[in-house]
């Protein structure tokens, strides 16, 4: 039997420092990651520190609104 409601949803994480100061960088663009989260355990918006290839450092990536 399949469950009626899926608890895990697919989300997109976006770098918060790329869009602000991207004019002096080598490559234009915004770093994005896709992942899944459990809505029951994490009802708030997710923030993770991930590597951004455009900034060439580890930065905070925030969950995008759907």
UniProtKB/Swiss-Prot annotation:
It comes from Angiopteris evecta. Keywords: Chloroplast, Plastid, Ribonucleoprotein, Ribosomal protein. Its main location: plastid. One of its GO terms (cellular component) is chloroplast. The gene is rpl33. This is Large ribosomal subunit protein bL33c. Belongs to the bacterial ribosomal protein bL33 family. Signal peptide: none annotated. GO terms for molecular function: structural constituent of ribosome. The lineage of its organism: Eukaryota, Viridiplantae, Streptophyta, Embryophyta, Tracheophyta.
């Amino acid at each position: 039997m399949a469950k009626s409601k899926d608890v895990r949803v697919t989300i997109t994480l976006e770098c918060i420092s790329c869009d602000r100061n991207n004019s002096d960088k080598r490559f234009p663009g915004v770093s994005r990651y896709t992942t899944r989260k459990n809505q029951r355990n994490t009802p708030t918006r997710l923030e993770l520190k991930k590597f951004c290839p455009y900034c060439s450092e580890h930065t905070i990536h925030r969950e995008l609104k759907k």
